[in-house]
């Protein structure tokens, strides 16, 4: 059995027994153990998700293969409440945003594209940066880990979803994109990751210093940019370029501990 053959399409078609065999092989390769294979709630698009424990830390099995990541801004139809928020909050606030929300999204979201990725293990929980970003890759490598590249992060977060957010098209009503509370952003994603759930606390660096996903450090909320733009940092394809620039600059050297990284383990 080769984990190189574990594609997302194949995972979709597998029964629980086959999923278990692949997950147990992944666990064997990293000297870990399969702690659970569970059915995924309906609406997530996947039948099962597998979590493996290695050295006291939990990792989700992320199938690879040819997958689609990014977001098709041109095809995006904002929901009525999103359009209203943009017009009456974001534009009316005088922040200088583009008149068309599609232009605003195109500035920060990566384009729709097809990529080929390996199957990997990815930490269920991201970890706080232990040092300035430039030193993190070497620190991870010393433990047999690495950072995800942007394509891998988007695939792991969206799990094949084509919507703006990993949970769907809408900004959840009556909840905030930060702090305690309930909502789809607080639930594990289809692969079992706790990811992109708090604009203040869940921002993650990647192997590319120009891409930070899962949050903006609260910039949009603090700025009062409006509901749509306050949720937008949690969009699966949002590379948060301003946040990435901040983290990579001199100010980021003093605040790196407020950001995260998600360890990845390669599989044979």
Model regions: which residues?
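Noncatalytic linker/hinge segments flanking ATPase motor cores
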Residues: 98-105, 188-192, 239-249
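Functional-site microenvironments in short loops/helix caps that host divalent-cation chemistry
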Residues: 135-227
């Amino acid at each position: 059995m080769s984990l190189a053959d574990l594609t997302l399409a194949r995972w979709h078609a597998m029964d629980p027994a086959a999923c278990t065999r692949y997950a147990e092989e992944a666990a064997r390769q990293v000297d870990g153990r399969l702690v659970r294979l569970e059915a995924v709630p309906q609406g997530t698009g996947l039948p099962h998700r597998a979590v493996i424990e290695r050295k006291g830390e939990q990792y989700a099995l992320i199938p690879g293969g040819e997958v689609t990541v990014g977001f098709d801004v041109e095809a995006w139809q904002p929901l009525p409440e999103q359009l209203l928020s943009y017009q009456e909050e974001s534009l009316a606030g005088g922040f200088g945003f583009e008149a068309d929300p599609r232009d605003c999204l195109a500035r920060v979201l990566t384009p729709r594209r097809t990529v080929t990725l390996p199957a990997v293990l990815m930490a269920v929980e991201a970890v706080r940066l232990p040092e300035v970003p430039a030193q993190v890759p070497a620190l991870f490598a010393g433990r047999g880990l690495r950072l995800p590249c942007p394509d891998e992060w988007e695939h792991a977060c969206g799990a094949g979803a084509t919507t703006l957010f990993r949970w769907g098209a809408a900004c959840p009503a009556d909840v905030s994109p930060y702090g305690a509370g309930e909502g789809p952003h607080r639930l594990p994603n289809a692969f079992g990751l706790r990811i992109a759930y708090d604009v203040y606390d869940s921002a993650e660096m990647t192997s590319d210093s120009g891409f930070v996903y899962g949050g903006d450090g609260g910039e949009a909320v603090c700025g009062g940019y409006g509901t749509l733009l306050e949720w937008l940092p949690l969009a699966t394809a949002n590379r948060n370029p301003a946040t990435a620039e901040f983290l990579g600059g001199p100010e980021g050297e003093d605040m790196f501990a407020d950001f995260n990284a998600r360890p990845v383990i390669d599989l044979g």
